[in-house]
């Protein structure tokens, strides 16, 4: 029986209760078989094109980098049906679930984007859907909660722990261990127990594949750097995957520095965590001195995650990708700038990557460089959050 590699260097693995091992093995085999089945590939590609709207545009910014010699392109995952890159891999996993004969889907969500994507795929493909969401996130993402319910999903608020994404993840896994015979756990990021990090990456890698073709057609060369925000890391690994072998291209992941990387209110486990076991995998993790999982913090619910996918941990360890961070304030500034000067309202998550690209352009305005930011989602879900912050600052 063919097997996928469970580890990226020392990171990854499958740290789950024994009861879940058969479900994960079944999933791995179904994925391997599906990848070799032209009918599965064809159905997946048809859904991506005719339902989700792929390929997404690669947009050259006209005004953001004025006064510098940087050319900045945006990979427009915000234009995808559902409003973010999440839809790509959700369609793939939902098709896999049907292939395995599962008729129920369990998911977790932070910002609500993965929940919405899961709900739309389940509505389309006739699957039952329940979504676990931290009670705090239910409050700060009410439009997405209503969207999920409109599409027939049951949204289950989680009040335990910090009532955010990590707690929703734990509850979803708990549910799955009782229901795996009928239900598929549709994990939302390139993290968690093997084979999820590999499956999610492969169902997101069209982001980088399209970007490579589009930039070569437009510029006749590869970019100097591709930049993406990193929470769990699926939009970033989707962008990076096709460039890993292209050594001339810098891969830059941007973690949330929250209220400051030297405070205890950030979400940057890659740079400021210690290796531990969390959510079924071995990965960098924000921990207190006693080894307990520390609360992560970010203004954007989708980056508010105390760990990171194992492939990012490996790319960081071997020096192939570099990981920096951006504060809430810098992300909010970039959010306003791109809205004001390009007519695009990005997700707060994606604004972290935009902020980093602008920092690169402005730190060295005379440097000629070609940058691509993965604009992973649109910002409709964030306008109330941003409005409240700007109002408090007296900025509006």
Curated annotation (Swiss-Prot):
In the record, which positions carry N6-(pyridoxal phosphate)lysine? 86
Output the Pfam families linked to this UniProt entry: PALP (PF00291)
EC number(s) in its UniProt entry? 4.2.1.20
User: What does the record give as its pathway?
Assistant: Amino-acid biosynthesis; L-tryptophan biosynthesis; L-tryptophan from chorismate: step 5/5
- What does the similarity note say? Belongs to the TrpB family.
> What InterPro entries does the record tag this protein with?
Trp_synth_b_CS, Trp_synth_beta, Trp_synth_beta/beta-like, TrpB-like_PALP, TrpB-like_PALP_sf
UniProt entry tagged with the keyword Chaperone: no
Q: Which NCBIfam families match?
A: trpB
* Quaternary structure, from the entry: Tetramer of two alpha and two beta chains.
The EC class name is lyase
Q: List the disulfide bonds.
A: none
Q: Name one GO molecular function term.
A: tryptophan synthase activity
What role does it play? The beta subunit is responsible for the synthesis of L-tryptophan from indole and L-serine.
This one is known as: Tryptophan synthase beta chain
Q: Which keywords are on file for this protein? A: Amino-acid biosynthesis, Aromatic amino acid biosynthesis, Lyase, Pyridoxal phosphate, Tryptophan biosynthesis
Q: What gene is this protein translated from? A: trpB
Catalyzes what?
(1S,2R)-1-C-(indol-3-yl)glycerol 3-phosphate + L-serine = D-glyceraldehyde 3-phosphate + L-tryptophan + H2O
- One GO term of the cellular component aspect? cytoplasm
Q: Which cofactor does it need?
A: pyridoxal 5'-phosphate
| Organism in which the protein naturally occurs | Vibrio campbellii (strain ATCC BAA-1116)
């Amino acid at each position: 029986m063919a097997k996928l590699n469970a580890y990226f260097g020392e990171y990854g693995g499958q740290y789950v209760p024994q009861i879940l091992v058969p479900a994960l093995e079944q999933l791995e085999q179904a994925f391997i078989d599906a990848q070799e089945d032209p009918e599965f590939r064809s159905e997946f590609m048809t859904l991506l094109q005719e339902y989700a709207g792929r390929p997404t545009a690669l947009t050259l910014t006209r005004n953001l980098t004025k006064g510098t010699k940087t050319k900045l392109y945006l990979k427009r995952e915000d234009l995808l049906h559902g409003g973010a890159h999440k839809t790509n891999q959700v369609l793939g996993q939902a098709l896999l679930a049907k292939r395995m004969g599962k008729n129920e889907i369990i998911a977790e969500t932070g910002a609500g984007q993965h929940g919405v994507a899961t709900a739309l795929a389940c509505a389309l493909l006739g699957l039952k859907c329940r979504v676990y969401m931290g009670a705090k996130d239910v409050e700060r993402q009410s439009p997405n909660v209503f969207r999920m319910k409109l599409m027939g999903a049951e949204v289950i608020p989680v009040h335990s722990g910090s009532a955010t994404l990590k707690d929703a993840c734990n509850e979803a896994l708990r549910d799955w261990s009782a229901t795996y015979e009928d239900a598929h756990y549709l994990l939302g990021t390139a993290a968690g127990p093997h084979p999820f990090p590999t499956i999610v990456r492969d169902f997101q890698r069209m982001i980088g594949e399209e970007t490579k073709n589009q930039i070569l057609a437009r510029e006749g060369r590869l970019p100097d750097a591709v930049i993406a925000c990193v929470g769990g890391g699926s939009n970033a690994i989707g962008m990076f995957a096709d460039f890993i072998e292209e050594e001339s291209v810098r891969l830059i992941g941007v973690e949330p520095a929250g209220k400051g990387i030297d405070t205890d209110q950030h979400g940057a486990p890659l740079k400021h965590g210690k290796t531990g076991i969390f959510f079924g995998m071995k990965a960098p993790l924000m921990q207190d001195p006693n080894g307990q999982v520390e609360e992560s913090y970010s203004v954007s619910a989708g980056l508010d995650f105390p760990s990171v996918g194992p492939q990012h941990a490996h790319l960081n360890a071997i020096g192939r990708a570099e990981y920096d961070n951006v504060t809430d304030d810098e992300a909010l500034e970039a959010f306003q700038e791109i809205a004001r000067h390009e007519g695009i309202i990005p997700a707060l998550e994606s604004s972290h990557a935009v902020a980093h690209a602008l920092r690169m352009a402005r730190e060295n305005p005379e440097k000629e460089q070609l940058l691509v930011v993965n604009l992973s989602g649109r910002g409709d879900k964030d306008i109330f959050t941003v409005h409240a912050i700007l109002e408090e600052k007296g900025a509006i």
